[in-house]
Amino acid sequence: RISTAEFHIPQSCLFTYDSTAKSKAEMGKNVYAGYLASAEVRSASEKKFERFCETCGAVDWVYKNGDKGAEYFSIVYIDSFGKQKSFFPDYIISVRGEIWIIETKGGFDRTGKSEDIDIFSPRKFEVLKNYLTKYGLRGGFVRWDDQSQELCICIEEYNENVKSEQWGLLRELVHKRGAEK
């Protein structure tokens, strides 16, 4: 049995920081005042996504979701054994007032080989896409592409191959959506 509950961004959140990181800049678009670029634990794709959001004029704000706990946003998916599991997308952002839900994954190396280690990515993509469609939201999976040195986004149909037409440049999609608003 799946239960649904209205989600609200928690009023406060505790973050740990890497005191040895060179960059300790405050990420001004994060919903939490004082959120630093050295927040831990985050993947390279998450750090690159946060930097993108921070410099993108179309992005209003960024919420870094937790990865477990009832206070965080999650969507249910079914694993290989038929068990219900909770999927916690990495980010909720606002692009010119429009809500997007984003999951970041391991990137692609220079040859286009996937560095995504999550075997449930295709299932998680489908439940995210269904959720976005049901609630009239935007979003998708975001991954770093070493060859183009760009963040890419997949929004329609999941494909492991970054060279496929399912992956587009995140900056182009965000700027296009921002210009339409």
Place the predicted regions along the sequence by residue.
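Electrostatic, structured charged patches in enzyme active sites and in nucleic-acid/phosphate-binding
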Residues: 1-181
